[in-house]
């Protein structure tokens, strides 16, 4: 009987998370923009990109630039 209540509670939590936008569930498996920048050979900078580099994206949820 306790198992069925636990399963029902878990199901309710998952459904409420999906109804609110599902940020937790969709965030699983996604890499941060900082990780993507650094792993592709870039640098995350808050200031302008150095000479001979270009902006390749963003870092820290759009607060910095990925320079490569």
Swiss-Prot record:
One of its GO terms (biological process) is antibacterial humoral response. The keyword Glycoprotein does not apply. GO terms for molecular function: CCR6 chemokine receptor binding; identical protein binding. Pfam families: Defensin_beta. Residues 1-21 form the signal peptide. Blood plasma. Sperm. Highly expressed in the lower head and midpiece of sperm. Significantly reduced levels found in the sperms of asthenozoospermia and leukocytospermia patients (at protein level). Residues 22-32 form a propeptide. One of its GO terms (cellular component) is sperm midpiece. It is found in: Secreted; Membrane. Disulfide bonds join 37-66, 44-59, 49-67. Keywords: Antibiotic, Antimicrobial, Defensin, Disulfide bond, Membrane, Secreted, Signal. Monomer. Homodimer. Belongs to the beta-defensin family. Has bactericidal activity. May act as a ligand for C-C chemokine receptor CCR6. Positively regulates the sperm motility and bactericidal activity in a CCR6-dependent manner. Binds to CCR6 and triggers Ca2+ mobilization in the sperm which is important for its motility. This is Beta-defensin 1.
């Amino acid at each position: 009987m306790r198992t069925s209540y636990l399963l029902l509670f878990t199901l309710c939590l998952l459904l409420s998370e999906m109804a609110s936008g599902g940020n937790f569930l969709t965030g699983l498996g996604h890499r941060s923009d900082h990780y993507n920048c650094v792993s592709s050979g870039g640098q995350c900078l808050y200031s302008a990109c150095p000479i001979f580099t270009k902006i390749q994206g963003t870092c820290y949820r759009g607060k910095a630039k990925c320079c490569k």
